[in-house]
Amino acid sequence: MPLHNLTRFPRLEFIGAPTPLEYLPRFSDYLGREIFIKRDDVTPMAMGGNKLRKLEFLAADALREGADTLITAGAIQSNHVRQTAAVAAKLGLHCVALLENPIGTTAENYLTNGNRLLLDLFNTQIEMCDALTDPNAQLEELATRVEAQGFRPYVIPVGGSNALGALGYVESALEIAQQCEGAVNISSVVVASGSAGTHAGLAVGLEHLMPESELIGVTVSRSVADQLPKVVNLQQAIAKELELTASVEILLWDDYFAPGYGVPNDEGMEAVKLLARLEGILLDPVYTGKAMAGLIDGISQKRFKDEGPILFIHTGGAPALFAYHPHV
């Protein structure tokens, strides 16, 4: 088996059973294409989401190193920070979060509701900064200060997106391949591409397990020119960790994230409303709404390689709906 080296890495089990892979009958009828969805929005901690897969590996490494504090960074409405804080609470660890306000809003819901509200429930120590201009350096500086206070910090990068964390999505590719085997031949897979770990992990896993399926990353924060090296660098780092080759071309669409990261747009919000009304499934304004807008437009514009079934990776994020009201 090509991914046997995954078992070499310490891993905590937070998710348990595979997340559902479901057919969307009403949405498929609406689009005239078979659409399936991988429900990583229902992972069983802190209102779900994809980062829990990464944290199974990252938190295991933190415990191996003897850490008593998890440190990470993100936007005020970061899904990753929320899930990291929940994992810290579950493991009895302290959590320090370095947060920015990337959209410069003073709206009370954004500043206090949604993911930010949940951080308080998890007893997270919040440190604000003007902007995460160099998050790796800023996290190291924060870790130095936390260590000086007598803690043993473990730094988790933005999005949990390093080679170790991204192994969670190599593992996810294995899960997807097993669920599809003998049931459906997926032609294309669509995922939001942000901090790049989910996209890169899937790219490595699917190349070896479902090589006939194309993987499309819909960017949520950057142009293709800026996002491509992030995904490729992680793809190669993951492959090196697993002693695999990774030669599949990284495919990115950057037509759907304007006006910028964390700012809702009309097509993304229409996608959120459409899936809610047709299937009772909640997307979010920052990641999955924009990625689903890409899927919908990609069908309309015939951007996919053929007319076969499409799998959408639902990475979660519904808590942000409350923060972005009244945009929603």
From Swiss-Prot:
The record, for NCBIfam families, names:
ACC_deam_rel, PRK03910.1-1, PRK03910.1-3, PRK03910.1-5
In the record, what terms sit under GO molecular function? D-cysteine desulfhydrase activity
Its family remark reads: Belongs to the ACC deaminase/D-cysteine desulfhydrase family.
How does the annotation summarize its subunit structure?
Homodimer.
Q: Identify the HAMAP family for this entry.
A: D_Cys_desulfhydr
Q: Which cofactors does this protein require?
A: pyridoxal 5'-phosphate
UniProt keywords, alphabetically: Lyase, Pyridoxal phosphate
The catalysed reaction is: D-cysteine + H2O = hydrogen sulfide + pyruvate + NH4(+) + H(+)
Cross-referenced InterPro entries: ACCD_DCysDesulf, D-Cys_desShydrase, D_Cys_desulphydr_bac, TrpB-like_PALP, TrpB-like_PALP_sf
PANTHER family named among the record's database cross-references: 1-AMINOCYCLOPROPANE-1-CARBOXYLATE DEAMINASE-RELATED (PTHR43780:SF2)
Q: What is this protein called?
A: D-cysteine desulfhydrase
CDD domains the record matches:
ACCD
Name of encoding gene: dcyD
Q: Name one GO biological process term.
A: D-amino acid metabolic process
Lineage runs:
Bacteria, Pseudomonadati, Pseudomonadota, Gammaproteobacteria, Enterobacterales
Instruction: Say what the protein does.
Output: Catalyzes the alpha,beta-elimination reaction of D-cysteine and of several D-cysteine derivatives. It could be a defense mechanism against D-cysteine.
Its EC number(s): 4.4.1.15
Chain positions found as N6-(pyridoxal phosphate)lysine? 51
Top-rank taxon, per record: Bacteria
